[in-house]
Amino acid sequence: MAARLCCQLDPARDVLCLRPVGAESCGRPLSWSPGALPPPSPPSVPADDRAHLSLRGLPACAFSSAGPCALRFTSARRMETTVNAPQSLPTPLHKRTLGLSPRSTTWIEEYIKDCVFKDWEESGEELRLKVFVLGGCRHKLVCSPAPCNFFTSA
């Protein structure tokens, strides 16, 4: 089962924070105040790191003892482009594998992975739904502005 994480922008520190979503949510809306501790969940990161994960472009699995996974990324706007007009997508200028060898990724995966880091590093969090998924990665993220409403199923 994929780990579920809620991603919130903390404007006070200008960072993205990932918080584990408890298995009891089962796709129902979930919200908590930005300073609250996350509900308990099976640790994918060391226990002392789970209470406060402040990230700039790093997936949750960056803290895993197994090393980071790669994440595929798209926003609602890019999903339309990716699904409906794949021939219009540019070749990525550079690829970020984060644990995957170049031979194990397709050009579309490289393009999508590159999008998330550009958005996080250059423009910050958009106020729209973002979905992060990659086959083989045990992390699945749903991002929305605070309060975090987790409404999809893994």
Curated annotation (Swiss-Prot):
Protein modification: A fraction may be phosphorylated in insect cells and HepG2 cells, a human hepatoblastoma cell line. Phosphorylated in vitro by host protein kinase C or mitogen-activated protein kinase. N-acetylated in insect cells.
GO biological process: DNA-templated transcription; symbiont-mediated activation of host NF-kappaB cascade; symbiont-mediated arrest of host cell cycle during G2/M transition; viral genome replication
Subcellular location: Host cytoplasm; Host nucleus; Host mitochondrion
Region (Mitochondrial targeting sequence): 68-117
Pfam family, any one: X
Entry's Gene Ontology cellular component terms: host cell mitochondrion; host cell nucleus
Highest taxon, organism lineage: Viruses
Alphabetized UniProt keyword annotations: Activation of host NF-kappa-B by virus, Activator, Apoptosis, Host cytoplasm, Host G2/M cell cycle arrest by virus, Host mitochondrion, Host nucleus, Host-virus interaction, Modulation of host cell cycle by virus, Transcription, Transcription regulation
Protein task: Multifunctional protein that plays a role in silencing host antiviral defenses and promoting viral transcription. Does not seem to be essential for HBV infection. May be directly involved in development of cirrhosis and liver cancer (hepatocellular carcinoma). Most of cytosolic activities involve modulation of cytosolic calcium. The effect on apoptosis is controversial depending on the cell types in which the studies have been conducted. May induce apoptosis by localizing in mitochondria and causing loss of mitochondrial membrane potential.
Family assignment from sequence similarity: Belongs to the orthohepadnavirus protein X family.
Subunit structure: May form homodimer. May interact with host CEBPA, CFLAR, CREB1, DDB1, E4F1, HBXIP, HSPD1/HSP60, NFKBIA, POLR2E and SMAD4. Interacts with host SMC5-SMC6 complex and induces its degradation. Interacts with host TRPC4AP; leading to prevent ubiquitination of TRPC4AP. Interacts with host PLSCR1; this interaction promotes ubiquitination and degradation of HBx and impairs HBx-mediated cell proliferation.
Protein name: Protein X
Organism: Hepatitis B virus genotype H subtype adw4 (isolate Nicaragua/1853Nic/1997) (HBV-H)
Gene coding for it: X
